[in-house]
Amino acid sequence: MMGLSFPVLLLLVIGFFFGWLLLLKFKLLFISLLALILGYKSIAVFIGFNAPVSFTTQKQTGAIRVVSWNVARFIELARNNNAGSNTRKKMLALLKEQKADILCLQEFHTSENPGYYNNIRAIREELGFSYHYFPYDKDGDRNYYSSVIFSRFPIVDSALLRYPRPSQPEALVQADIQVNKDTIRVFTTHLQSQRFDKLDYARMQKIKSREDSLVYHSIPIVAKLKRGIVIRSIQADIIGEVRSNSPYPVLFTGDLNDVPNSYTYFKVRGELRDAFLEKGYGLGRTFRGLSPTLRIDYIFSDSRFSVAQFKREKKNYSDHYMLVADLQLNNP
């Protein structure tokens, strides 16, 4: 839980640093400086230090454009007209605009029930993806839910690894994709969420407004946070082992439900490159709720890829922002 409080701690340390500097309290200044030095690893993954650069729609020759997005089931499940609500249509249009080669979507829902939307068919037909891997879980009558990988390149092999209970239905989705003469291994996943409900959000609001006992409202929230951290740590260990055994260059995308200062982040990422840190700037928030500092969605790639450009699509269609990265495969 230290990772969640890191932004506050960082601001406090920086504030004390400049406060001691103004007061010429050099011993205390040294303590603040030492804290910043010791926290360098966490600071380095928390902030993107690159200069803001416009994202170029036209890809460089040989670049692979990757999109990762938690689409929150496209907001709606049941049909209300032939094409869906304005939000669903906007989400599909935004995906189409990216001209991605590989599309990784979390919290994806589709259906073969005529009363619901067949989003697999919509993306294949409207966005022109020839290949996909969707190892689904049933979500009602002919309704299906999971993470999914779409590709314009052939998917030559695929696999699904389910995390141990009680984390189901979360799973690690894997696809081996043939890009010209090379094969890359793509992972996508959605890790254990905090499982906050409406009552928990009401408690948070009371904590913010100090309407009632801070301790009383904090206890159930802290319990859910601790449970989520433990489960995600187990999931992260599994991902780290599977990722390290890949015979191909690795591309990892997903919603980790954890911040960059966490065990989950460092274990899943390992030696991979974080596309946001390579080309992004600022705090890189990806989740619209709770806090303006929550970067919990990621695109990682191994050293055989270079990151040409990166962006977040800050459209409020889902509760997560879309991530887009152009990658170049070098000497696989």
Predicted feature residues:
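Active-site metal-binding loops of divalent metal-dependent hydrolases
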Residues: V71, F108, L191, D255-L256
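Internal/C-terminal transmembrane anchor helices
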Residues: L24-I47
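Metal-dependent phosphoester-hydrolase catalytic domains
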Residues: M1-L22, L29-L33, L160, V230-L251, ...
